[in-house]
């Protein structure tokens, strides 16, 4: 979203540091603090929520790799994971987040998992249904500004390569098979279909 607004997309280290500061500010404000904050990226002076929440508001953070998983475990209440390959999601996100949670002696790691799934009768139907979403899994999607260019990139790749980035179901039973492991194996508190 930065590119269309004329901003450069920062490298991961800066994005992570910005997220860390943001989460710290948000949590402290939600907890009722009158906040003076002087960070590298953000500053506040006497910031306060004058209508604070009555109950704890959980902060969820998406993570796609071990660094973000550690950041989520430390600063958020839960981690959101896009599961393409369940084994890969466990190794790259869930295990690091759980290990960081144990290291910090926290007991509140909550999981929200989701999968990009097409409900289609066959591959042709699925390919057509994916038309406006194909670029979502194209290479360089974090650097490219124009969604149309991402779709063109995706359309230039072998169809199977793009289709393999999504799950496909043609019946409710197949849909259950795709999503059941997110509950049974991952123990997700929230599963998005």
Could you say what each language-model-derived stretch is?
Residues 1-193:
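Active-site-adjacent structural elements that line small-molecule/cofactor binding pockets in enzymes
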């Amino acid at each position: 979203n930065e590119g269309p607004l004329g901003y450069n997309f920062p490298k991961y280290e800066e994005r992570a540091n910005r997220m860390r500061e943001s989460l710290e500010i948000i949590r402290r404000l939600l907890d009722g603090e009158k906040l003076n904050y002087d960070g590298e990226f953000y500053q506040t002076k006497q910031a306060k929520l004058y209508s604070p929440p009555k109950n704890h508001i959980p902060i969820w953070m998406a993570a796609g790799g071990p660094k973000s998983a550690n950041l989520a475990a430390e600063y958020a209440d839960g981690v959101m994971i896009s599961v393409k390959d369940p084994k890969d999601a466990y190794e790259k996100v869930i295990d690091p987040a759980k290990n960081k949670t144990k290291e910090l002696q926290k007991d509140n790691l909550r999981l929200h998992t989701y999968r990009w799934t097409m409900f289609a009768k066959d591959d042709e139907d699925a390919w057509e249904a994916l038309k406006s979403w194909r670029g979502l899994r194209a290479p360089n999607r974090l650097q490219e500004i124009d969604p149309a260019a991402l779709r063109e990139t995706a359309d230039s790749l072998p169809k199977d390569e793009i289709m393999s980035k999504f799950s496909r179901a043609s019946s409710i039973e197949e849909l259950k098979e795709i999503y059941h492991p997110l509950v049974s194996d991952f123990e997700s508190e929230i599963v998005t279909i």
